[in-house]
């Protein structure tokens, strides 16, 4: 019977970017937060160890989704089979509901969902739970290797893509280096979220090139950026440990405030109580907003600064073009949705209402069948 797995979206609660490194990559510091919003990935697999046959077939309801080895779900399944020395005939179908290349980590989440589905289809998930399992067990004779231990799964996920490992944790997650070094943080309690998807494309490689030019213009060296990211990591750790970082409410360097003012009260969110939303920001906004002014305006509408329904936090997610706002109540979120109904600077925006997802809920809700 096919296995259906929810493939949840993520947003970034702040994203610090370092100067370009010698290897061409950039060090990052961010907090990922998973959402209820999801694709559905269906996996069908048959063990073909005896026949020594292996095949992967991928389909989707969205023609923009690659149906070959370029797809992260395909890569994840192929790497898992190779690493375990296993053989299987695998079919993957991605029911695409999340934006493609929108900054929500959809492709990376698809990869983890495909791995979870593959494990269940071939019975690897049951074997991994067996405390008596060893590398010399009979399962090893069937090509099922040691990679199913959590640390190995994270290594394989990182080999597929920078954002992939976070989806093996879920909830609220600290991401370091290129984003592939991940650590679970205490979950924020669920809050309402509006995801705004504009009909505007943002090229991530181009955004990084613009960032590199900005670093050069401002004289940000590799050493200075390393210090910047270390300080940001410590600040995140303090905030999620219940300490309030120093620094007051201010507009981000992109010029658009990320939250709407003093929301203190007996039912305040931990996002406000820790003070984290008063200082975190997404560095990509500094280079993306000047190129796409409509995105800055969408963030302004989501934040609704100075109003009773102001967001707890609003930001670009990843390099965009998707933006999001977090809200204390459903009513506040619905008002934000209403503000997105008309085109913004000539750009149509699709607004979606969802909620943030704790780690427990993430795993409890993942497998549908």
Residue ranges and their predicted role:
Residues 73, 102-127, 145-150, 157, ...:
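DPxDG-like acidic metal-binding loop motif
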Residues 34, 158-159, 165-168, 184-189, ...:
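Solvent-exposed alpha-helices and their adjacent loops that cap or buttress functional pockets
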Residues 1-102, 106, 119-128, 133, ...:
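ATP-binding N-lobe of GHMP and related small-molecule kinases
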Residues 169-313, 328-331, 338-341, 345-369:
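Conserved, helical-rich catalytic subdomain that frames metal- and/or nucleotide-binding sites
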Residues 50-66, 114, 156-158, 272-282:
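Short, basic/glycine-rich phosphate-binding loops at helix/coil junctions
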Residues 66, 93-122, 161-162, 312-327:
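Glycine/serine-rich anion-binding loops at beta->alpha junctions
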């Amino acid at each position: 019977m096919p296995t259906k797995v929810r493939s949840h979206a993520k947003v970034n609660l702040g994203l610090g970017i370092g100067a370009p490194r010698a290897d061409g990559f950039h060090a990052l510091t961010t907090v990922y937060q998973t959402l209820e919003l999801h694709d559905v990935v269906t996996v069908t697999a048959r063990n073909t160890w005896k026949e020594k046959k292996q095949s992967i077939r991928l389909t989707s309801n969205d023609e923009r989704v690659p149906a070959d080895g370029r797809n992260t779900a395909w890569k994840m399944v192929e790497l898992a089979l190779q690493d375990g020395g296993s053989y299987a005939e695998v079919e993957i179908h991605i029911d695409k509901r999340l934006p493609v290349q929108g900054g929500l980590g959809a492709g990376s989440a698809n990869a983890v969902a495909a791995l979870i589905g593959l494990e269940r289809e071939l019975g690897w998930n049951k074997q991994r739970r067996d405390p008596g399992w060893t590398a010399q067990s009979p399962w090893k004779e069937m090509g099922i290797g040691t990679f199913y231990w959590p640390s190995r799964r994270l290594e394989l996920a990182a080999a597929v893509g920078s954002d992939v490992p976070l989806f093996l944790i879920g909830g609220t997650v600290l991401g370091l280096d290129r984003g592939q070094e991940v650590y679970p943080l205490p979950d924020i309690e669920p809050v309402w979220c509006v995801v705004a998807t504009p009909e505007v494309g943002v090229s991530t490689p181009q955004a990084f090139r613009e960032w590199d030019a900005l670093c050069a213009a401002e004289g940000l060296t590799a050493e200075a950026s390393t210090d910047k990211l270390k300080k940001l990591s410590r600040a995140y750790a303090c905030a999620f440990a219940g300490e309030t970082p120093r620094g007051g409410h201010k507009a981000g360097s992109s010029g658009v405030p990320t939250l709407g003012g003093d929301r203190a009260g007996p039912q305040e969110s931990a996002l406000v109580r820790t003070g984290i939303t008063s200082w975190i920001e997404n560095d990509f906004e500094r280079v993306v907003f000047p190129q796409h002014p409509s995105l800055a305006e969408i963030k302004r509408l989501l934040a609704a600064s100075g109003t009773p329904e102001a967001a707890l936090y609003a930001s670009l997610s990843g390099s965009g073009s998707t933006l999001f706002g977090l809200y204390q109540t459903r009513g506040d979120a619905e008002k934000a949705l209403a503000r997105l109904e008309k085109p913004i600077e000539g750009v149509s925006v699709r607004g979606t209402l969802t909620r943030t997802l704790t780690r427990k809920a993430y795993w409890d809700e993942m497998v549908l069948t």
